[in-house]
A protein has these predicted regions:
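N-terminal secretory/targeting leader peptides
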Residues: 2-7, 13-22, 30-121, 129-331
Length: 331
């Protein structure tokens, strides 16, 4: 994205939000407005969580803190939203952990392939001093702090062109990935052709054959309706994604102690409920997709793991910091 285009998008976001704020001002002149944006569809559990957090905070503060939610990429791509939160054009964003690696490289390890043993392992590490340390670096570098971590799910590959049983079947496969270097390295280790695309462009790209497939957790495949344009679900389970909730530091500073406690408490309550909903959906959706006509493939997972673990951790150790992989793995 060129610098001029990025400023054009940012200006457009700012103008739209300024208009919304001006319109609302007569009703809530004294309220602190926090705009929370996400690329996820309105029916995704993470967006349901956003709405519940907004309501609880509004109720507990008597309307003094008004969280406005903007799902479904209304305000831009993942990168756009993080940059807008950093600048203060919006105040809260939730995104996959590795997306923050563009500012603090250590964040990308949190979506490293085959790092997490399960959701519980991820939760233990992501509520540890590791996250506090990364958050402090994010505040210093880009004026954002992490105020919540949720479970986004275990990621699997889907294909619109062929069944994938072993990693050899990925050779030349056009795999959509987020704009994240660790995802690119993983796809390359598989022999695939990594193709970065914004999430909002993915459904159309799959339907038109611009890419052969993608990878995401089951609830995202469901909520974004990727099952409509993909024939095969391949249970690779290659990455467990923690989704980070970040707030602009100036916005955080504008809240008093009780308001901060209300926001954190609501995030803890509804974040846990969201995690449980994601886990429940993961337990049912394979059968749902199968009943809907998708072919479900249980691949040779070790053939996917081996080339990735042989190359990716060593490639990124200097970026992450020596010993960080082992420190996280020990939780």
């Amino acid at each position: 994205m060129s610098e001029s285009r990025r400023w054009t998008r940012r200006d457009a976001i700012g103008a739209a939000l300024a208009g919304a704020a001006f319109t609302a001002m007569p009703l809530r002149a004294a309220a602190t407005t926090l705009r929370w944006a996400s690329v996820l569809p309105a029916n995704h559990p993470a967006v349901v969580m956003m709405e519940r957090v907004a309501k609880q905070v509004r109720d507990e503060t008597g309307g003094a803190v008004d969280i406005q939610t903007f799902p479904a990429g209304q305000l831009g791509s993942s990168r756009d939203l993080i940059e807008a939160t950093s600048s203060g054009a919006i105040q809260i964003v939730d995104e996959g952990a590795a997306q923050f690696g563009q500012f603090v490289p250590q964040f990308s390890i949190l979506e490293a392939p085959y790092l997490w043993r399960d959701a519980q392992h991820m939760r233990r590490a992501c509520t540890s001093p590791v996250i506090d340390e990364m958050s402090a670096m994010l505040v210093a570098k880009r004026q954002m702090r992490i105020i919540g971590v949720t479970y986004y799910g275990n990621r699997h590959v889907t294909s619109g062109t062929k069944a994938i049983n072993r990693v050899d079947d990925m050779k030349g496969f056009k795999l959509r990935i987020p704009e994240v270097d660790t995802f690119r390295a993983m796809a390359e280790a598989w022999g695939a052709r990594p193709t970065p695309l914004n999430f909002g462009e993915l459904y159309l790209a799959l339907s038109q054959g611009v890419v052969d497939g993608q990878e995401n957790p089951l609830p995202t495949i469901q909520s974004a309706k990727f099952f409509e344009v993909q024939k095969y679900l391949v249970l690779t389970g290659h990455i467990i994604t923690p989704r980070l909730i970040a707030i602009n530091e100036g916005a955080w500073a504008s809240l008093d102690a009780k308001q901060r406690a209300s926001l954190k408490g609501a995030l803890d309550t509804h974040g846990l409920a969201q995690d449980n909903e994601i886990l429940a959906q993961e337990g049912k959706l394979v059968d749902t997709f199968k009943a809907g006509g998708m072919t479900v493939v249980t691949p040779d997972v070790e053939s996917f793991r081996k080339p990735v673990l042989a190359s990716v951790p060593a490639k990124f150790e200097a970026k992450w910091g020596k010993g960080l992989w082992e420190r996280i793995a020990a939780y």
